Amino acid sequence: MNIKIAVIGLGYVGLPLARLFATKYPVVGFDINQNRIQELNAGNDATLEIDESTLKGVLVSSSSNANGLYCSSTIEDIQNCNYYIVTVPTPVDKNNRPDLTPLYKSSETVGKVLKKGDIVIYESTVYPGVTEEECIPVLERVSGLKFNVDFFAGYSPERINPGDKEHTVEKILKVTSGSTPEIGQRVNELYKSVITAGTHLAPSIKVAEAAKVIENSQRDINIAFVNELAKIFNLLEIDTHAVLEAAGTKWNFLPFKPGLVGGHCIGVDPYYLAQKAQEKGYHPEIILAGRRLNDSMGEYVASQVVKLMIKKGITINGAQLLMLGITFKENCPDVRNTKIVDVVHALADYGIQVTIFDPWAKPSEVAHEYKLTTTNELPSATFDAIVLGVAHKEFTTIDLSKLKKSNGVLFDVKGVLNEKADGRL
């Protein structure tokens, strides 16, 4: 059987995967954002995950049976595919409840073109049971086909690390699964054909779903632990980073650093597992405690900065502060669920005027998402305080002394500045 793949959703997860598959198979990348499609077909990836030459190296001008990637927002272009890989976001709502709307919508799209023998693979991070209990019924309803008789499903959780040019998609081992043992093997072989790091075939879709959601929950809890340590050691006037460095000399000490936990994965996925646990009558203690602690860190950083400013005799109301970075992580333009926003809002509550400088973030995106003004140009003014919130590579070469007033405060959230900061986590 000739394999033809449709990748639904061309964001940070879908595009690198579609590009990789396109080196071996005919691939149609589908996204409802027409501007995104136009950019990609011109060889421009706004997420900066794929460079122009690499992207143009796989692009083709039409949906055919030739190897390569064709990007489209027209549903007819995916109707001849036999593998559908769904890579849409799985966010939470304002009450931190899972929002499966993107999954439902993409399942409806696939259902409209689903044929006998097709396989639908989900990569979006979900709680155990979503694929078979939430997505499959949508596929059956829209297509009129019967699951595991007419069409089949798989689940292979994404492990993309945005901004990481070392651990790219083909270099990260892939967990795979299928709705039957035979389909599991077929899904596994498909990924194995392009993932050089290898694959791990899980015994069921639910096992694969659970594996992914605990990867991120474990990381969230570990960061919450060191964030709590940072609060304690700050009260004891001990350098947290020095403590972690000393403790890290033991071979089995886990290397985590304190910080703001944002983005579309670590700060979101634990809520998916918590929701499923609560549905079954169990209240997760550690998972939600970790979330509460990590969500409190933005306000904590702001309060620490203000205390340092007061100690230096700086008038808080009307003070000028430079925030370095707004994205959720370094060397990446992604501003989804960034916790720098919590710091900015908390500082503004004190009456501090915050200027946000980030060479990676799109000002229009930040304005749309958070109603905040950012600049890609380094300001020429001097400030009462500077907060390094994101460890972009550009920030390590800036002479911050020229931007800071003589008695100004420098706070290093990430612990990366060579010069002596007045405070850090």
What name fits each language-model region?
Residues 1-425:
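Structural/interface elements that position substrates and couple domains in central-metabolism enzymes
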